Every structure is written in structure tokens, then in C-alpha cells.
Amino acid sequence: MEVASLYRRVLPSPPAVEFASAEGKRLFAEALQGGTMEGFFNLISYFQTQSEPAFCGLASLSVVLNALAIDPGRPWKGPWRWFDESMLDCCEPLHKVKAEGITFGKVVCLAHCAGARVQSFRADQTTIHDFRAHLTRCASSQDCHLISSYHRSPFKQTGTGHFSPIGGYHAEKDMALILDVARFKYPPHWVPLTLLWDAMNTTDEATGLLRGFMLVSRRSSAPSLLYTVSCGHGSWKSMAKYCVEDVPNLLKDESLDNVTTLLSRLVESLPANAGDLIKCVIEVRRKEEGESSLSKEEKERLFLKEKVLQQIRDTDLFRVVHELQYPKGLCGSCSSSSDEDSLAEIAATVCCQGAAFLSGNLVSRDGFCCRETCIKCIEANGDGLKTVISGTVVSKGNEQAVDLLLPTSSSKTSLCNSNLKSKIVKYPSSTDVLTVLLLVLQPNTWLGIKDENVKAEFQSLVSTDNLPDLLKQEILHLRRQLHYLAGCKGQEACQEPPSP
């Protein structure tokens, strides 16, 4: 039986004014003359329609990130780096967003994970006068864009909660231009700012919190290279609680009389799925027939990731953590069988995810089976050999070959043309992740250590003051991500964390 279909909706007017109408054009011309349409041109250049009915938040953010010319640092399709909804999955699995939509706080988290600077305000954390001032500032600049989270009912539109970028502002008429990403439903339209405020001042039933708006702009520093904070797994909540609440409480124990004991207690108390919070960013590309080298940009990205990885392993904290995890004196070039199994599992999982995304399946890797994986070395355009994991993924009888560009630290062991488990690979390991996690926690976390000597020694180990610049930027970015993750799930405004 054929399901009834719809072809667009008639825009209720009033209260809205269609952008392409005679009145809409007049409002545009007057606002342009008034200087409050400066952000419009970049937004309209990268404006897109949401690809799924519940992808309004992802589409709005994708438009804004591309308008700000923020480089995602990884390919979208072919050689092209470009923000697409499929790449905005660090804070919520795409299949869940497709089924349920996405909350205000998760969109804020996504924007930050993507490398943007974000200020967010729920309606009860600001005023309509402040909102008007923020919108005027953004509309008068090409460097900042505003995304609104609102309910459609005040505009007499069908539907419920929605996200869209605001493309401009008419100061005299006090009207805002909504660039509705659901273009299959409503065209861009002008609405009274007071009505938009009412639409944001509504409760999202999924969270019990009010909707609001966020200001998105470029950062002066680059986003993280090797790791990212992820809340795509349900276990992130227990890990966030561990970082923010459990660790400070644990440090009150007066029996923690040396750094080794302190670290042991921290490791023993880690939640079972601690590794789900901080994830390594692994680049996946479709393997083209006859392709046997890395491009200049792929080589540069891999080089920077390897540099960060090596800088992590050069820290005193890594040495202490490694000695704690391998008390029998395993050398730095050694790896346990569990590490090898972990690499094999990671390779198979990422190969399937990558193949699913590259084939256009944005929400699930079900039906994708990784038949085999192997390690090889390929030429990096005359700059030596780089380690790549190749995998063959099977889906519905069709095979797809993919490559994982794997950052590794220096090793004397040859990896070329080896089976995945036949050689030892110094890939990002659990020791690296634990080291990063300890560095990422806010400095005031450790103030509760009772023994002053232990406190001083431990604070020296986790201090970012003497870290190399590349690693320091990585840690500070992850620290901001964790701050957003902990703060945006509750009543607090998702503002910038305190300076280190």
C-alpha cells in the first residue's frame, strides 16, 4: 500500500513573510542597506537541505561550519574535505539522531568537537534584549553565525522542535530571517524577533530544558588532531561523573601517600567502559585500484598525529602510567596479546564504519562485515613509508577495499606487508588514552590530594605548562570538549571553560 506523500507546506503568513515575496525582498534590501545582512552571503553560499526529517540540527551546523570555512581535517568524499551531516557523529550516533532528533546541548557539543568556538544560551539564561544584541552583532559580521533552536507552533507552522541558522536581521522592523533547512517543507522566511524569542522560550520534552540559541565562530587555534571526546556511547555519562565527581572524592583518602598508589587507585576505580569517552580519530579512505601512495595532505595529517602520539609517550606521566600497567618491565616496544587483539578489533570496526559512510549509509554499519585486515607500508610521496591498515569489507555480496591511515610512534620493527597480528604495532593504546585522560582533567581536580608532597609531584606530572605546543593544544581542546560534555547536559550554560 502506497503511503500518502506531501509536496511542501504553505507558509503561514502572517506571521511569517516569505523571503522570495515582494515584501521579503524589500525587507532584505533594507536590512542590507542597514548593514545587518553581512553574514547572509556566506550562509546562503553553503545553505543545504537536511537529508533526513530529523537532521535539522546536523544540517544547520553543517551549513554554519562550511560558511565559517572551518576545515574538518578529514575527507568527505574523494579528496574533498567538507562538512556533511554524516561527519557530525561524535556526540550522538547518527542512527539515534535519525530516529529521535538531537538536543540543544548535543548540537553545542558537536559544534565544539568540529573545531568551532561556541557560546550557547537557553532562553532562561538570557533576555530578549541580549538575544537582539547578539543577533545584531552576528548579522553585522561574517565571522559569527547564530543557530536557533525553536518550536514551530508560535509561527503557526506544522511540526515541533526545529533548528535553523538565522540569516539576517531587519533592525527597524525587528524581524529575523530564518534560513529553514527543511526546504522541502518551508522556504526561508522573515519572522518578528519577539515571536522567535517566544518560539525559543519553549520546553524540549526530551530534556525538560528550554530551547535557545548558539553563537558559532572560528577558533584561533586548531582543533584536536589525534583524539576526541565522544558521547556516542551511553557509558559517557558514568565516565563524565567519574571525572567530575568521583575523582575529587577519591583524592580525599589520606592513605594516598605516593604517586604510584594514587595512580593505582585511579585506575582501579575507572568505569568498565572508560575507553569510550576519549576516542582516537582514525582517517578512512576508499582504496582506489592501483593507488600506492599518500597524498601530501594525507601525509601531513598523519605526520602531525604521529608527532602528537610521540609527544604523549615522551611525557613523564606516560612513563609512570606505563610502568604501572606493565610492572614486570615490558619495554616500550613490547605489546601484549590483548593489545594486538584490540588493534584487530579496532581495525575491523573502523573498516566497517568507514565502508558504510563511504557507500552513503549514514546511520548504521549493519550488514557490513570486515572479511580481512592486514598491515602494509606505503610510500608517502618520497618521504618514506607510512603504516596503513587495509581491509576488505563485504556488504550484500559486494566487496569494498578501504584503508585506515594509522598513526604510529617510531619503531625499529618492520611492519611492511605483514598480517595484522604477526607484528607489533605502536598504535594509540590504552596507556596513551589513560595518559591523555589524566592530562585533560581540570587542574583544580587535584587540589584535594591531602599529602602536600604527593600533590606537588602529581601536579607536576599532569601540568600542561611544559608540554610541547602541539600536544598542549591537543590537551586544551579535549579539556574544553569535556567541559562542554559535563556542562551542557544540565542546567548550566555551555560557555567556555576557565583558562588553564
UniProtKB/Swiss-Prot annotation:
Reactions catalysed: [Glu(-Cys)](n)-Gly + glutathione + H(+) = [Glu(-Cys)](n+1)-Gly + glycine
The family this protein is said to belong to: Belongs to the phytochelatin synthase family.
Tissue expression notes: Expressed in roots and shoots.
Keyword Transport: no
Protein keywords: Acyltransferase, Cadmium, Metal-binding, Transferase
Stretches that traverse the bilayer: none
Annotated control of activity: Requires cadmium for activity.
UniProt name for this protein: Glutathione gamma-glutamylcysteinyltransferase 1
Gene that encodes the chain: PCS1
SUPFAM superfamilies: Cysteine proteinases
Domain named Peptidase C83: residues: 1-221
Enzyme Commission identifier(s): 2.3.2.15
Function noted in UniProt: Involved in the synthesis of phytochelatins (PC) and homophytochelatins (hPC), the heavy-metal-binding peptides of plants.
Positions annotated as active site in the UniProt record: C56, H162, D180
Alphabetized GO MF terms: glutathione gamma-glutamylcysteinyltransferase activity; metal ion binding
One GO term of the biological process aspect: detoxification of copper ion
Domain of life: Eukaryota
Induction: 5- to 10-fold by 100 uM cadmium.
Alphabetized Pfam families for the sequence: Phytochelatin, Phytochelatin_C
Keyword Acyltransferase: yes
